């Protein structure tokens, strides 16, 4: 048995081509008819007349044959067109029947799960609508989530994208209406599929106000890529920031990249939260892991986190082989062994580093009474807690971001120096405004500068006495700080004593305190540690130049 495959579009095209050929031939025959059917005799004699008549008859016979061929050609073209129409009609009928059969088959397959679970077994989720803005879930076995509805009314957020089942991609989040947030992207399939991108926030319609926040990007399951967060909505007015960018979605647990945060704010500023009075923190995403609370520490250089902050053991494996292995510690009584990996750090609002060094703690050992007691207390509540997690968890911190260019370590580099463009020039710690700003120094002049960050020389007055030069560390993560005993002339902190700190013997005063209100720890030797106090009431900018030394810039010296 033979099979014939016909493409109606090709038949229609062929019929048109054949018709064009026929038209060309008819035109040529018509042009030649006059000169071939009525020839003039070459002379007045009988022979010339007979020859002319003979050739004229040939022309007339050719025209008769051409007319018959033209009629056949027209019939052939009509047959082609008729066949094309017949095949097209048959194809449409079959397609309709197949669609009906497919619909009926899917209906039969999906009916049990829709009845029991409210979602199909196979098929894409429906897109969101004005009355039901969230996209529908994809089929439990196969199917993409529906896209969220993009709102147009003021104050109405975008719909969330639907999530996939076993295999499929998450739906995109819908755009927010004016002054409203975008919808979250749907999650990709549990086995395979990508997350849906977060919806953009709506633009502000209120003068001087930022737009809506971007939606969170959808996460992947085992295999797939997490999606980027949605962009924050545009602000209303010149110089007005966008809304906050949405967070990126987690990548596949076994394979796949992670999404990054959407553009937001002014593209260089993130919130700075002060916890427990002395701990300046930001929220960052390392290696696409969970959002972590990170201490901003001018007293060290390099980012130190636990495995949980990079996505657990699977996150560690995603980063590949470490580039180094070393040991470091904190003065509060904690030593740790860490491996250095290369990955990105996402501070939010689209502020993401290039691949940079990140230190992941493999083993930690408490050595001080505080660190030991804190660890055992945490261990009773959670047997999986490590000494590192307990040490910083006591103050609500997950890791430490060292930003001091001439700090001792742990290194090997400062992640904020891997930010793109001019964002890598320095960082402003603005505790009064609750902001961390990346890039060139935004502080208005005049400012007071101290060469070195964090290690420099400061001058200390005790109750208005002669300034004493003291090697110091300007340490935002130093809590209440330390002071050498030789500076105060005692091994214990005297009560009701006024202590002032200056840039030079006759220079500007940077900060001051009374020992009844602020009590640094007295040490027998070593550097004076300012603790957080200089940062508490004034913005302080850490300039990464000169290279390897840095400059500390105070906006409003006390």
UniProtKB/Swiss-Prot annotation:
Active-site residues, record numbering mapped to chain: 297
SUPFAM superfamilies associated with the record: PE/PPE dimer-like (SSF140459)
Domain of life: Bacteria
Keyword Hydrolase part of the UniProt annotation: yes
Pfam families: PE (PF00934), PE-PGRS_C (PF20729), PGRS (PF21526)
Record's signal peptide: none
Major localization listed first in the record, in broad terms: secreted
GO biological process, one term: proteolysis
Cellular location(s): Secreted; Cell surface
Record note on modification: Undergoes auto-proteolytic processing.
GO cellular component: cell surface; extracellular region
Domain PE: 1-93
GO terms assigned for molecular function: aspartic-type endopeptidase activity
Keyword line: Aspartyl protease, Hydrolase, Protease, Secreted
Its biological purpose: Aspartic protease that processes the lipase LipY and other PE_PGRS proteins. Can also cleave itself.
NCBIfam families, per database record: PE_process_PecA
UniProt family annotation: Belongs to the mycobacterial PE family. PGRS subfamily.
Protein name: PE cleavage protein A
The organism of origin for this protein: Mycobacterium tuberculosis (strain CDC 1551 / Oshkosh)
């Amino acid at each position: 048995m033979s099979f014939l495959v016909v493409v109606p579009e090709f038949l229609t095209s062929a019929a048109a081509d054949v018709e064009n050929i026929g038209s060309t031939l008819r035109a040529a025959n018509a042009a030649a008819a006059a000169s071939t059917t009525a020839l003039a005799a070459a002379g007045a004699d009988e022979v010339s007349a007979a020859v002319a008549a003979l050739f004229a008859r040939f022309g007339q016979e050719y025209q008769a044959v051409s007319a018959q061929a033209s009629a056949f050609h027209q019939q052939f073209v009509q047959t082609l067109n008729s066949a094309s129409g017949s095949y097209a009609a048959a194809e449409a009928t079959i397609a309709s029947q197949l669609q009906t059969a497919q619909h009926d088959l899917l209906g039969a397959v999906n009916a049990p799960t829709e009845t029991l679970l409210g979602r199909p077994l196979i098929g894409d989720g429906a897109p969101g609508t004005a009355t039901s803005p969230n996209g529908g879930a994809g089929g439990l076995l196969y199917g993409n989530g529906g896209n969220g509805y993009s709102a147009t009314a003021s104050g109405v957020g975008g719909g969330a994208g639907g999530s996939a089942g076993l295999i499929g991609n998450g739906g995109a989040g819908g755009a927010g209406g004016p002054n409203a947030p975008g919808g979250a992207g749907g999650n990709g399939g549990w086995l395979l599929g990508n997350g849906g991108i977060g919806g953009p926030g709506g633009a502000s319609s209120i003068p001087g106000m930022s737009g809506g926040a971007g939606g969170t990007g959808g996460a992947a399951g085992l295999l797939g890529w997490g999606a980027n967060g949605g962009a924050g909505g545009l602000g209303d007015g010149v110089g007005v920031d966008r809304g906050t960018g949405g967070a990126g979605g987690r990548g596949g647990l076994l394979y796949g990249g992670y999404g990054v945060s959407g553009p937001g704010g002014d593209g260089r500023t993130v919130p700075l939260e002060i916890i427990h009075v002395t701990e300046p923190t930001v929220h960052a995403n390392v290696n696409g892991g969970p959002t972590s609370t990170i201490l901003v520490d001018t007293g060290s250089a390099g980012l130190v986190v636990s495995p949980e902050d990079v996505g657990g053991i699977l996150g560690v494996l995603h980063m590949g082989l470490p580039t180094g292995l070393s040991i470091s510690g904190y003065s509060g009584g904690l030593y740790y062994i860490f491996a250095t990996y290369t990955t990105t750090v996402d501070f939010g609002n689209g502020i993401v580093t290039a691949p940079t060094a990140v230190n992941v703690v493999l083993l930690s050992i408490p050595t001080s009474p505080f660190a030991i007691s804190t660890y055992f207390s945490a261990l009773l509540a959670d047997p999986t807690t490590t000494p590192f997690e307990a040490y910083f968890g006591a103050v609500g911190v997950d890791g430490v971001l060292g930003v001091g260019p001439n700090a001792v370590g742990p290194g090997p580099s400062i992640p904020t120096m891997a930010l793109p463009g001019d964002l890598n020039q320095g960082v402003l710690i603005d505790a009064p405004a609750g902001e961390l700003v990346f890039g060139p120094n935004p502080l208005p002049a005049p400012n007071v500068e101290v060469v070195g960050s964090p290690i420099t020389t400061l001058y200390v007055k005790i109750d208005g006495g002669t300034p004493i030069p003291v090697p110091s560390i300007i340490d935002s993560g130093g809590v209440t700080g330390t002071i050498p005993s030789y500076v105060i002339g005692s091994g214990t902190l005297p009560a009701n004593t006024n202590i002032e700190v200056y840039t030079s013997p006759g220079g500007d005063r940077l900060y001051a305190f009374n020992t009844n209100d602020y009590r640094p720890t007295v040490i027998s030797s070593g550097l004076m540690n300012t603790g957080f106090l200089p940062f508490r009431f004034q913005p302080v900018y850490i300039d990464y130049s000169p290279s390897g030394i840095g400059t500390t810039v105070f906006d409003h010296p006390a």
